């Protein structure tokens, strides 16, 4: 809803069929497309909207992928971007000196076991350094009011091409 009148076309992807159906029902605009697709297996032939993309938004998904997969995703996404790209990443990070890895961890909030890798700032910056071209990087903490744990918190990374 925020983007439909600010762009020629919008493509939202998610691995969850249920979430894609909710998006289709709630955001039924001619220029908005939603697609079930794994972010780790992007192929231009499969996309409902043709590349190149000016803006890419990645939120809350990278904690579920291993390092090699994230490096591949960054490379694949970069190849789908226009030369004047903006990439926004919002992720939960470790506020410890090292990453925090949870495997088969029971969450009372989720009422289920889950796996996640909460990486450090430096680890994320290493991923971002894999983006081609002359870029600027802005980063900061957000959603302080949602910070329930001292070990983790939300951060954003705003990567822009410098032409």
Q: What are these model-predicted stretches?
A:
Residues 52-53:
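Local beta-strand N-terminus motif with an aromatic residue
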Residues 60-64:
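Short catalytic micro-motifs in class I SAM-dependent methyltransferases
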Residues 1-47, 65-72, 76, 85-163:
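Class I (Rossmann-like) S-adenosyl-L-methionine-dependent methyltransferase catalytic domain
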């Amino acid at each position: 809803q925020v983007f439909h009148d600010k762009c020629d076309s919008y493509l939202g992807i998610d691995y969850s069929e249920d979430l894609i159906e909710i998006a289709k029902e709630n955001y039924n605009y001619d220029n908005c497309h939603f697609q079930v697709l794994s972010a780790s297996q992007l192929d231009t032939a499969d996309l409902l909207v043709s590349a190149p993309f000016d803006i890419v938004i990645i939120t809350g998904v990278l904690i579920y992928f291993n390092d090699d997969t994230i490096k591949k995703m960054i490379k694949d996404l970069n190849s789908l971007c226009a030369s004047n790209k903006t990439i926004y990443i919002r992720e939960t990070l470790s506020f410890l000196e090292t990453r925090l890895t949870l495997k088969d961890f029971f969450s009372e909030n989720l009422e289920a076991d889950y796996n996640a890798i909460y990486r450090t700032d430096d680890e994320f910056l290493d991923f971002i350094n894999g983006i081609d071209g002359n870029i600027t990087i802005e980063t900061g903490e957000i959603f302080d009011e949602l910070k329930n744990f001292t070990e983790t918190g939300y951060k954003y990374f705003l990567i822009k091409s410098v032409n």
